[in-house]
Amino acid sequence: LAFLNSESGRRMTQAAGNGKLRKEQPFVLGVAASEIYPEIYQDIQKRSQEADENRKEETILIQGIIDVWFEEEDGLVLLDYKTDRVRNASQLKELYHAQLDYYAQALEQLLEKPVKEKIIYSFALKEEIIL
């Protein structure tokens, strides 16, 4: 009930009424290995100074399911539910910031529209966390 009364809950209800709400969106996203593991990639580059110029960087595929996204007039809103038992919102931000960044990147590539907002809703804290 707390979620439905939250700002995100109200916005989702409005988006659903406008036909602009999507749930459980699967995706696959190709990300350069150097983006995910920059320290390792830099170390490999340093060790192979004689590396072949034509060698291509590895791509890592990330797949997942976005809990909820909806469209408002000025962009997309990404919402991820979390049930983790944490003490405060900053713990969830630290744990899941990268995950939501990749989710946003996937949505932007898929829909060719900007993600204007990334939100975590913590059921344990009964709180919206804007990233």
PLM regions with names:
Residues 1-131:
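Structural signature of nuclease core domains in nucleic-acid processing machines
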